[in-house]
């Protein structure tokens, strides 16, 4: 019985790092896709950030503070105040450890919304840095191509 307990302890100790290594086999695009799904689509702000974002997360948006905890502190109340907010991910493009997400953000169902591009740098399966730009979807366009 004691030998079984020792063997089980050794096995668990050896496989725990392997489980983390398996997760880190994810490509940056896969990390961002999982993060964006959990954050934007499922609106699980805290879980998404605690799972996929580095504590020292660098934020380049001049209206937001840097750091994972600061992002959670800002975004949780935002989603509570805007329960009808929705995001439609249009495309995710990766180049090495940089991933761009083009999405349509709306605050209400009848809102034309914003065309948003988030650029994220992934390091060791965690989002380490973020840039974003947003442009209002106009009522009328000079062309018929659409923003998405």
Q: Where are these predicted regions, by residue range?
A:
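Bacterial N-terminal signal peptides
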Residues: 5-15
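C-terminal and inter-domain tail/linker signature
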Residues: 18-148
């Amino acid at each position: 019985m004691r030998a079984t307990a020792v063997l089980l302890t050794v096995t668990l100790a050896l496989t725990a790092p392997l489980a983390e290594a398996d997760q880190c086999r994810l490509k940056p695009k896969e990390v961002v896709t999982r993060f964006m799904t959990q954050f934007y689509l499922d609106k699980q702000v805290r879980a998404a950030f605690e799972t996929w974002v580095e504590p020292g997360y660098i934020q380049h948006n001049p209206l937001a503070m840097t750091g994972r905890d600061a992002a959670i502190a800002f975004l949780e109340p935002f989603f509570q105040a805007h329960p009808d907010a929705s995001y439609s991910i249009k495309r995710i493009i990766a180049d090495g450890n940089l991933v761009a997400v083009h999405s349509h953000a709306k605050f209400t169902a009848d809102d034309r919304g914003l065309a948003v591009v988030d650029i994220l740098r992934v390091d060791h399966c965690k989002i380490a840095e973020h840039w974003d730009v947003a442009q209002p979807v106009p009522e009328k366009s000079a062309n018929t191509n659409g923003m998405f």
